[in-house]
Amino acid sequence: MKKEFKVISELIENKSKALDVGCGDGELIKYLIENKTKDIRGLEISKESVQNCLSKGLSVIEGNAENDLMQFPNHSFDYVILSQTLQAFLNP
């Protein structure tokens, strides 16, 4: 477990809805499912990473956060997580 997973977990209320933007290998999603909330999804730009997450049974879709976040209706999530992601945005 990465050190920041515990910190992120402490900020999220139990049984809340969360989206992990740029979820990569899905390890944070897996950690949060096991320790905090079952209702968490991921958005990832890498097709290979998405396939890897799906093979682990994680709810992840392929998309570019700068363009595809709009597909989610307002108030879909209680938390949106950008762990190691914000620096990749062109216009943060």
Where does each model-flagged region fall?
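Conserved alpha-helix/loop element of class I SAM-dependent methyltransferases that forms part
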Residues: 1-15
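Conserved class I S-adenosyl-L-methionine
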Residues: 16-24
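Class I SAM-dependent methyltransferase SAM/SAH-binding core
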Residues: 27, 31-68
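Short conserved loop adjoining the S-adenosyl-L-methionine
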Residues: 68-74
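A conserved beta-strand element that flanks and buttresses the S-adenosyl-L-methionine
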Residues: 81
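Short catalytic micro-motifs in class I SAM-dependent methyltransferases
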Residues: 84-85
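A short, conserved alpha-helix within the catalytic core of class I
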Residues: 89-92
